[in-house]
């Protein structure tokens, strides 16, 4: 029986996502023996500093990529929003699965919406993109960094450390925690991270056998949307150091891409959106990035450089 080894982080969410991919592969190939290879990453272990301060979201990938290079794993499963915009050779995104809910969720045990939070409320999130949008809509809020897995973050909220926290809806749904969502923060008013809500499978470019196996998981509409989002971010030279949001969706007549660049310090947001009748995510992403730059995003990007 052919064997396929999936490298995965050890968190409950990462294990859920990897087991989901494994189950899909077993359905496609009943003759395939799919096993998980759990491991810790530096991004999981260093929790007392922001991601921007310790090297970015690529820290969630490095150990998994090394396992593939050593021959200890054949592929790795990630939340696509955690995958750097430019994967360095010899790695590629072999599959992007159908997207789940791309929105963020406000979670509070007392208050029912972002608008109902009291003046000066304590809201925690590690994402600069979320912080910038919070600052735009509620400049009075006190914002805090919050790292760790989903249950760790919820526990800090439940212990009274904060009045509210912001997490991704998709992660909560995958863990069966939908009931913790107080309010959805969703497009068009609130933009997610590029690729948010999608699961990605990474493999070695040169491994044609694995690439062919994983291609059966790929969802073309999702891939085309996230290509537009990630291209926009790449054209802006965005990273976890920069508050960038993007969301592409199919509508009657083609694809719409909405983008924003923000500033945590003063809550400024620069927005742009365009539609394309063609499935040209790269072109649409570059066009929206240029619109953002023309509208003043360059100043915000320079301020965070």
Curated annotation (Swiss-Prot):
Q: In which pathway does it act?
A: Porphyrin-containing compound metabolism; protoporphyrin-IX biosynthesis; coproporphyrinogen-III from 5-aminolevulinate: step 2/4
The kind of enzyme this is, by top-level EC class, is: transferase
Give GO cellular component annotations, separated by semicolons.
cytoplasm
Ordered alphabetically, the record's keywords are: Porphyrin biosynthesis, Transferase
The protein's matches in Gene3D superfamilies, at most eight in alphabetical order, are given as: Periplasmic binding protein-like II, Porphobilinogen deaminase, C-terminal domain
Tell me where in this chain the PTM S-(dipyrrolylmethanemethyl)cysteine is found. 240
**What molecular functions are annotated in GO for this chain?**
hydroxymethylbilane synthase activity
Member of which family? Belongs to the HMBS family.
Give the protein's biological function.
Tetrapolymerization of the monopyrrole PBG into the hydroxymethylbilane pre-uroporphyrinogen in several discrete steps.
Report what the protein is called: Porphobilinogen deaminase
Q: Which gene encodes it?
A: hemC
């Amino acid at each position: 029986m052919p064997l396929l080894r999936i490298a995965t982080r050890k968190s409950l969410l990462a294990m859920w996502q990897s087991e989901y991919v494994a189950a899909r592969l077993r359905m496609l190939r009943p003759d395939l023996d799919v096993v998980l290879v759990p491991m810790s990453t530096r991004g999981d272990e260093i929790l007392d500093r922001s991601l921007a301060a310790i090297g970015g979201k690529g820290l969630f990938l490095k150990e998994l990529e090394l396992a593939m290079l050593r021959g200890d794993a054949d592929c790795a499963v990630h939340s696509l929003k955690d995958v750097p915009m430019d994967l360095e050779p010899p790695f590629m995104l072999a599959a992007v699965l159908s997207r789940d809910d791309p929105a963020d969720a406000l979670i509070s045990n007392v208050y029912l919406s972002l608008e109902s939070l009291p003046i000066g409320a304590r809201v925690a999130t590690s994402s600069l993109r979320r912080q910038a949008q919070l600052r735009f809509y509620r400049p009075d809020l006190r914002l805090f960094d919050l790292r760790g897995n989903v249950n760790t973050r919820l526990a800090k909220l439940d212990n009274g450390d904060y009045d509210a926290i912001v997490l991704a809806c998709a992660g909560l749904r995958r863990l069966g925690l939908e009931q913790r969502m107080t309010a959805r923060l969703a497009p068009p008013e609130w933009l997610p991270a590029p690729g948010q809500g999608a699961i990605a499978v990474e493999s070695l470019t040169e491994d044609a056998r694995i690439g062919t196996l994983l291609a059966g998981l790929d969802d073309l509409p999702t891939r085309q949307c996230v290509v537009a989002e990630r291209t926009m971010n790449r054209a802006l030279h965005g990273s976890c150091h920069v508050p960038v949001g993007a969301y592409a969706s199919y509508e009657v007549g083609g694809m719409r891409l909405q983008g924003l660049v923000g500033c945590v310090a003063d809550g400024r947001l620069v927005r742009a959106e365009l539609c394309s009748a063609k499935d040209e995510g790269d072109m649409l992403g570059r066009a929206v990035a240029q619109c953002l730059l023309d509208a003043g995003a360059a100043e915000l990007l320079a301020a965070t450089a």
